Amino acid sequence: MQAIQDEIKQLTDELNQHNYRYYVDDAPSIPDAEYDRLMRRLQELEAEHPELALADSPTQRVGGEALSKFNQVTHLKPMLSLDNVFSEEEFNAFYKRVGDKLPDTPAFCCEPKLDGLAVSILYRDGVFERAATRGDGTVGEDITENVRTIKSVPLRLRGSGFPPLLEVRGEVFMPKAAFEAVNDKARAKGEKLFVNPRNAAAGSLRQLDSKITASRSLAFYAYALGVVEPETWPLAASHFEQLVQLKEWGCPVSSEVKVCADIPSVLAYYQDILTRRSELAYEIDGVVLKVNDIAQQQTLGFVAKAPRWATAYKFPAQEEITQLEGVDFQVGRTGAVTPVARLQPVFVGGVTVSNATLHNADEIARLGVMIGDSVIIRRAGDVIPQVVAVVPEKRPSDAQAIQFPPQCPVCGSDVERVEGEAVARCTGGLVCEAQRKEAIKHFASRKALDIDGMGDKVVEQLIDKELVASPADLFKLTASAITMLDRMGMKSATNLVNALEAAKQTTFARFLYSLGIREVGEATAANLANYFKTLEHLKQADAETFMKVDDVGVIVAQHLVHFFEQPHNLEVIDGLLQAGVHWPDIEEVAEEALSLKGQTWVLTGTLTQLNRNDAKAKLQALGAKVAGSVSKNTDCLVAGEAAGSKLTKAQELGVKVIDEAELLAILGS
């Protein structure tokens, strides 16, 4: 038995070494026939002695039992997206922004921007443990079994020196040859074809049956380290050197990665990759540029959803000429009225395009486009088709001007366009069918009226079954009507009716927030409530008065004026008040009672005696501004249980930190 165990280990190690030479070094070390012979021998031994199979055996890539659904995974560290630049001018502006914040001129690590899907792969003690999609950057889907089938993903890291916990981030993609093979097979079976390699990779990676994923010849390139534990683990000081380290540990890295010391060399790299784009074995849509020095990256930091130290320099999208046959006006869930060009179908960038966005009235005027024109279509970012130019010499004599509608094409409400904004919007947010679902979901949400049990799916069913058309209709619902919904028995329906009754007791700030007024978030709603004290005073205000409120500028003031000018909005508000929605009066607070006025506070961790929203509201009532992140301008951090990175940053910056007990004492609870 020991001899068999030794042979299994020898075959596993030998095959993994050949995989490394093939997928990472791009230098096959044996003929395919010899590789196949070794693989068959290992499969025979493992079939006879399954208990001896090793976790990193290459036979484990064939796929396992099909899943019923993907589980969600919360990333240990957010997977942020990248900002884009589309021209040399925009790149120069990015370079200047970066250079202005650093004492030394930065070098950039440059690499092709793969047109695939970002994934996170965790290794614990060098062994593949979990893989997840990027998702929304915070929460992704567990695709462990599917990624396990990708031959270029090491199931065990090579060598030594890797940390006990290592997150490898990279891109899963489908090489062009594999894409053609998949489509050839689908074509032979009369099945639907994938339109491009990215869609094929996405469809393959999100298969519930990993055997299908295994058959699709996906590939993986690592592009960054993610979480490393312990955090003190010694790592290379540059991004390029970290990629070299990943390659030494067995993770494939693009052979096109290069460090560029200055603007000319970055631009030359961009042009070189653009020129060779069609020659590469995989689809790309630009190049990624990252400040190479890790210390400089840390100095630059992040904005809300992207690092300041990196950008994607996108390639020009593919373009074609076709005829604009008409324009439809679509109303989005936030009320944005968008002109959409109806086109004579044309094949652009791998897909047939029959519609393209015209964005807004300003863009129509800038283009000078008319119905009947021949137009140039571009797939912006290789995804969203748009009209980018008119071919004036082809304009027909019967071309017609495009008229922007003064009323919403869905509900007939006025269409407004606030000065300084490009987007025109329907003002019927509370009654417009196009916005109805989002308006009522917002109204019922936790930070608004907080209607327990009124989730998104319940709202969608209520509207689809025409039980509710506006927020006021929610309070007319009966338990018997609610039982018409899927999976809603009498007990659940009664609970929801009781929750609706309880939600009638709210606060003025929550009520204002629940109305979904454009640009009026939770903090602005609280400021409005504290300033005006009553709904009647607020409804009578003009733009000048609104602008006296903290955080209310010209645009928000105009949104408020337009909202309260619309009769249908006032009708919905009256309906809510008649249904019994109410709130306690807001008492005048003396200036000296605003003990925290001018201070910025941050909450982190779990509060056990006070929920987060109540704590925030009480701090705001004392004049504090409650922010979402810690900075040098933070006056105090409230650290609840399991406080994380915010606490660490506060301690590093010397920000005052208190616990929940101290907060309760300050609030007088």
UniProtKB/Swiss-Prot annotation:
Cellular component terms (Gene Ontology): cytosol
Disulfide bonds: none
EC numbers on record: 6.5.1.2
An example Gene Ontology biological process: DNA repair
Top-tier EC class: ligase
This protein's UniProt keywords: DNA damage, DNA repair, DNA replication, Ligase, Magnesium, Manganese, Metal-binding, NAD, Zinc
Protein residues bound to Zn(2+): 408, 411, 426, 432
Domain BRCT: residue ranges: 591-669
InterPro entries (alphabetical): BRCT_dom, BRCT_dom_sf, DisA/LigA_HHH, DNA_ligase, DNA_ligase_AS, DNA_ligase_CS, DNAligase_adenylation, DNAligase_N
N-terminal signal peptide: none
Residues at which NAD(+) binds: 32-36, 81-82, 111, 134, 171, 290, 314
UniProt key word Iron: no
Cofactor: Mg(2+); Mn(2+)
Coiled coil: none
Active site, per annotation: 113
Catalyses which reaction(s): NAD(+) + (deoxyribonucleotide)n-3'-hydroxyl + 5'-phospho-(deoxyribonucleotide)m = (deoxyribonucleotide)n+m + AMP + beta-nicotinamide D-nucleotide
Record has Thylakoid as a keyword: no
GO molecular function annotation: DNA ligase (NAD+) activity; metal ion binding
Its biological purpose: DNA ligase that catalyzes the formation of phosphodiester linkages between 5'-phosphoryl and 3'-hydroxyl groups in double-stranded DNA using NAD as a coenzyme and as the energy source for the reaction. It is essential for DNA replication and repair of damaged DNA.
Family annotation (PANTHER family): CHROMOSOME TRANSMISSION FIDELITY FACTOR 18, DNA LIGASE
Homology family: Belongs to the NAD-dependent DNA ligase family. LigA subfamily.
Protein name, UniProt field: DNA ligase
Organism: Shewanella loihica (strain ATCC BAA-1088 / PV-4)
